[in-house]
Amino acid sequence: MSQSLANIVVHLVFSTKGRRPLLRDEERGQLHAYIAGILKNHDSPLIEINSVRDHIHILFAQSKNHAPAKVVEQVKTWSSVWLKQQHAWYADFAWQGGYGEFSVSPRQVEAVRRYIRRQQEHHAQKNFQTEFRHYCEKNAKPLDERYAWD
């Protein structure tokens, strides 16, 4: 086959360093738009994004031309730099060192979109750690708690 095809949808989740509740409503929409631009520049279009005070969920179509870890690195690095430029509130802002990256089957994309859109509702009832543990279990991905929470 002379053509290269890829249909890889990724659900990316990561928190603020130490799960500090730093993401303010005032910057959230602009942050989401900025991250969408980073993904677009890496040929990985955004499908859905939402965040709460201490973490973010990003659903996107992973490019076949860019390594997944590199795309995540760019999103985390440049969004952190951008936040620090927005307000003194973010002077010592950092994302956690790690992240969760889960593949999403085409049949599940809409369900994951709905899940991401409803983050504020979810987190009225459970915290990020509980949510992330559940998501790892659901995706058959063992979680080593010694290294999961920085």
Model-inferred region functions:
Residues 1-150:
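Basic nucleic-acid-binding interfaces
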